[in-house]
């Protein structure tokens, strides 16, 4: 039987799908290994906090800038397509926020349900509190990504009119925010949650416009080495923490430089990645990871909770962290999480289909922004306070309100058009199934 050819939209770059997909296993494995459980009664904590080699591994293994570069590529591609159809910025923000809000709401309910089962089975209350706080930490990406996505129409306009000035302004703001506390000013580092990731997202705009691929390969390599060199200056000369994970909260200029290094290295590797993506096995693997990307990212914490609960129920010990026994047991530990996650990938999409169909109506920009703020506020509360706090119910209610508002849309005219980026992704996934 002749295999049907893969239909790929003309504005889709499979090298972007590749890097987004391969980043997911890195995130899952890192979070799984970071989960330390120790003591009597047990407590959950960051197992790698005292493991010094991790700091230098993160110079290569910290892939969050690549996520935002890929997100910037996808965001400006979607927004430009929407503009050509005559859609509004409010509708773009509505669709993108809804595509984040629905999955994260269900995943948060999944975490709470698992924790409730563990509590009913007699798990220690303080262990559950520390464990629940650790499970909430990956939510930072959802909150920040929702904010950055809502800025895409504005940042795309600035990119079109004054791209260079936009890059330099964002970079200058990042440096200023870093320097103010160092000179006795107020602690304003939280502002870099916006400035750093907007800058890195903007790098994805440059990838979309083929800025970097037009440069000589020797120049790209030189720029990547220079970015890493400036990181060394910041660490050894200015006292920055060499651990890129430590530089996440709040983000610092080191992540900006790492984003630059990664965009140059990605551009160098793009021809090889595109050649790899012409192979059917690679398309199958990347298509599967892309198809279940949101499930993998959001539900790997549920998978960890299920594995921990099963380990406690079976009376299996938790070895002291960083010991030889602990490192050896990380292999079955990670494999168990992957197995549960694979099962969740088969179940969760079916559950997600219970959502009512959204009304295709144009949403005014102020309403779309307000709904996005509600989403970020709800996720942000659980992120900073943990799942097991009195405010969790209110936070989930806030997210549910945002979902209802985004689903209904606004008082504008009916639209016959389909959702934007997700249409492309779902078609690509369907094509992957036919390979």
Where are these regions (language model features)?
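Alpha-helical transmembrane segments and their immediate juxtamembrane cytosolic regions
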Residues: 2-421, 432-435
């Amino acid at each position: 039987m002749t295999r049907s050819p893969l239909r790929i939209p003309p504005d889709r770059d499979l090298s972007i799908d590749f890097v987004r997909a391969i980043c997911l296993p890195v995130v899952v494995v890192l979070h799984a290994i970071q989960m330390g459980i120790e003591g009597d009664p047990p407590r959950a904590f960051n197992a790698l906090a005292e493991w010094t080699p991790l700091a230098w591994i993160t110079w290569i293994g910290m892939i969050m800038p690549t996520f935002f570069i890929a997100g910037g590529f996808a965001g400006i591609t979607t927004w430009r397509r929407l503009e050509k159809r005559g859609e509004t910025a409010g509708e773009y923000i509505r669709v993108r926020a809804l595509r984040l809000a629905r999955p994260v709401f269900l995943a948060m309910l999944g975490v709470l349900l698992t924790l409730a089962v563990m509590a009913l089975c007699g798990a220690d209350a303080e262990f559950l509190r520390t464990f629940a706080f650790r499970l909430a930490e990956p939510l930072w990406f959802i909150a920040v990504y929702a904010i950055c996505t809502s800025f895409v129409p504005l940042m795309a306009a600035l990119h079109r009119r004054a791209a260079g000035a936009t890059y330099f302004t964002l970079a200058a703001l990042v440096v200023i925010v870093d320097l103010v506390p160092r000179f006795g000013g107020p602690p304003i580092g939280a502002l870099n949650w916006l400035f750093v990731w907007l800058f890195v997202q903007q790098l994805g705009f440059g990838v979309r416009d083929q800025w970097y691929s037009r440069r000589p390969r020797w120049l790209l390599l030189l720029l990547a080495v220079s970015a890493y060199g400036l990181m060394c200056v910041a660490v050894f000369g200015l006292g920055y923490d060499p651990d890129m994970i430590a530089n996440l909260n709040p983000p610092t200029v080191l992540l900006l430089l790492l984003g630059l290094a990664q965009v140059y290295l990605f551009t160098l590797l793009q021809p090889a990645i595109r050649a790899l993506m012409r192979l059917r096995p690679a398309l199958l693997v990347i298509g599967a990871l892309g198809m279940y990307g949101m499930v993998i990212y959001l539900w790997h914490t549920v998978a960890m909770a299920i594995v921990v609960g099963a380990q406690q129920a079976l009376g299996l010990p938790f070895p002291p962290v960083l010991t030889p026994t602990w490192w050896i047991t990380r292999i079955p530990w990670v494999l168990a999480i992957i197995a549960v996650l694979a099962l969740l990938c088969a179940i969760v999409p079916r559950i997600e289909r219970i959502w009512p169909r959204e009304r295709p109506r144009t949403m005014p920009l102020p309403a779309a922004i307000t709904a996005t703020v509600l989403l970020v506020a709800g996720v942000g509360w659980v992120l900073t306070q943990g799942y097991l706090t009195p405010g969790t119910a209110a936070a989930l209610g806030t997210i549910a309100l945002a979902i209802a508002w985004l689903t209904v849309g606004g008082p504008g005219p009916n639209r016959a058009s389909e959702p934007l980026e997700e249409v492309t992704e779902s078609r690509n996934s369907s094509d992957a199934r036919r390979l």
